[in-house]
UniProtKB/Swiss-Prot annotation:
Cell compartment(s), UniProt: Cytoplasm
Chain location of the short sequence motif Gly-cisPro motif, important for rejection of L-amino acids per the record: 142-143
Function: An aminoacyl-tRNA editing enzyme that deacylates mischarged D-aminoacyl-tRNAs. Also deacylates mischarged glycyl-tRNA(Ala), protecting cells against glycine mischarging by AlaRS. Acts via tRNA-based rather than protein-based catalysis; rejects L-amino acids rather than detecting D-amino acids in the active site. By recycling D-aminoacyl-tRNA to D-amino acids and free tRNA molecules, this enzyme counteracts the toxicity associated with the formation of D-aminoacyl-tRNA entities in vivo and helps enforce protein L-homochirality.
Organism expressing this protein natively: Cupriavidus necator (strain ATCC 17699 / DSM 428 / KCTC 22496 / NCIMB 10442 / H16 / Stanier 337)
Full protein name: D-aminoacyl-tRNA deacylase
EC number: 3.1.1.96
Gene that encodes it: dtd
Amino acid sequence: MIALIQRVAQARVTVEGRTTGEIGAGLLALVCAERGDTEAQAERLLAKMLSYRVFSDAAGKMNLPVQNMDGNGNAGGLLVVSQFTLAADTNSGTRPSFTPAASPEDGRRLYEHFVAQARAAHPQVQTGEFGAMMQVSLVNDGPVTFWLRVPPA
């Protein structure tokens, strides 16, 4: 399972003109399930994401996770958006292949599991809509962007 995470000052996702998710400071996570992924990969990816230290501490070092982004125990927002294109195979030609991505059914199941686990573990979780054409707007903070991956079993 893959997540492209970005540290943001704010982010929003809209579908057909209506806002489905919006956060202030925190992480925007573009999430993709790959063929062979299970709930175990989703849970490991979420655990890594929530503890990944991308926010600055008092000394200015990236040393704090989204769960404690101000160093005083206050959590930042987490905006989770499905994006199957993260699994694209771009090694040949000029058109990406999406064969490595999970099927739409498995992708939805794993995305929904990821979101449910995120909501159980983190106080501020917003989402896009799986399979929808979405507009994602953000104010990148840094920019700070990381590619996280838990390979299929």
